[in-house]
């Protein structure tokens, strides 16, 4: 630091630069994460809004790239891997927070600004009905070009009805720009573009900072569903699984009881139904040779009954395969996603 001060003194560097480097050095030392954002195309006057939002969470500094590099060196950080990002006007964000969550804030936080020539509309740009506060005069012809119906009342221009002057994707008409400004309409969204993050020695480019939360949620839900199905199959002894496991075991026991004719209050209906079905099948097989003196169901009825029984079996199998419902998965993930 003494060498730097001496070198700067010899070159007659302004004292504010010395103070700036000193402040930046302390910020770098006391921050877990540093994000570098581009100020190209971003209104500098909008930074105060971001500062207010991040107050207590991050410190935002606009400084020269050369001063940042000197400060980083003083703090014991090599800027070799950051060189490609230290071009053009930049803003530096110093924080102790996670770089991914901090970047997500900038991804989602959009600010409005007035439209400039060549800007495209992201949503419908509407001139609303009512008093514009503009005196009648040449401005009427501008409204006419934009096909905005007007009337003059008390010497002021009034818009008759809400009028769309640009749809999403359209270039906002140049004629509309001064009118939109006078009406205080800011139709263009801007956000601070993060170039890179430096976190505890790691350099993380912007493309690697983006979080696909919906994708993560879907993957976790799928993993939970698969784990739950496996847990039911192996009868893993936890409360959420056991209610499904016990139900499955009970169904399997009833099926086995009906096959071997084991009679209990719970299996009685299944055992008797199975016995009746076998009796009818046997009676049908010998009815052509022996007069049994009973009326047997037709082949079609028997087939229908068998089909119905098979469908019920299939439904049971499907229910077992499905495992937990979406609601149950949701409650299971509640602790993860709040």
From Swiss-Prot:
Cystine residue pairs: none
GO molecular function, a single term: structural constituent of ribosome
Record's keyword annotation contains Transport: no
Membership in a protein family: Belongs to the universal ribosomal protein uL10 family.
Organism: Saccharolobus islandicus (strain L.S.2.15 / Lassen #1) (Sulfolobus islandicus)
Start-end of Basic and acidic residues biased regions: 309-325
UniProt region (Disordered), positions on chain: 297-338
Protein name per the record: Large ribosomal subunit protein uL10
The keyword Nucleotide-binding appears for this protein: no
Composition-biased stretches (Low complexity): 298-308
Function according to Swiss-Prot or TrEMBL: Forms part of the ribosomal stalk, playing a central role in the interaction of the ribosome with GTP-bound translation factors.
GO biological process: cytoplasmic translation; ribosomal large subunit assembly
Keyword set, alphabetical order: Ribonucleoprotein, Ribosomal protein, RNA-binding, rRNA-binding
């Amino acid at each position: 630091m003494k060498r730097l001060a001496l070198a700067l003194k010899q070159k007659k560097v302004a004292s504010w630069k010395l103070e700036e480097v000193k402040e930046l050095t302390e910020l770098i030392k006391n921050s877990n994460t540093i994000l570098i954002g581009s100020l190209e195309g971003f209104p500098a006057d909008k930074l105060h809004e971001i500062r207010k939002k991040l107050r207590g969470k991050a410190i935002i500094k606009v400084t020269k790239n050369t001063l940042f590099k000197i400060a980083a060196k003083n703090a014991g950080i090599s800027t070799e891997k950051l060189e490609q990002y230290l071009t053009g006007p930049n803003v530096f964000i110093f924080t102790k927070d996670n770089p991914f969550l901090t970047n997500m804030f900038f991804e989602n936080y959009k600010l409005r600004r007035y439209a400039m020539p060549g800007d495209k509309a992201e949503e419908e740009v509407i001139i609303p009905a009512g008093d514009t506060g503009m005196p009648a005069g040449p401005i009427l012809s501008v409204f006419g070009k934009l096909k905005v119906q007007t009337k003059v009342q008390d010497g002021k221009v009034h818009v008759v009805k809400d009028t769309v002057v640009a749809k999403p994707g359209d270039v906002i008409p140049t004629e509309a720009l001064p009118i939109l400004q006078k009406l205080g309409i800011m139709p263009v969204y801007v956000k601070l573009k993060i170039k890179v993050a430096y976190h505890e020695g790691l350099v993380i480019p912007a493309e690697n900072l983006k979080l696909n939360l919906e994708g993560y949620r879907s993957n976790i839900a799928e993993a939970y569903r698969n784990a739950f199905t496996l847990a039911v199959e192996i009868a893993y002894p936890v409360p959420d699984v056991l209610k499904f496991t016990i139900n499955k075991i009970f169904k399997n026991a009833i099926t086995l009881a009906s096959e071997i004719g084991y009679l209990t209050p719970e299996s009685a209906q299944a055992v008797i139904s199975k016995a009746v079905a076998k009796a009818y099948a046997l009676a049908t097989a010998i009815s052509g040779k022996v007069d049994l003196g009973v009326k047997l169901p037709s082949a079609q009825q028997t087939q229908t009954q068998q089909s119905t029984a098979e469908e019920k079996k299939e439904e049971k199998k499907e229910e077992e395969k499905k495992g937990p419902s979406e609601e149950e998965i949701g409650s299971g993930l509640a602790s993860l996603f709040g």
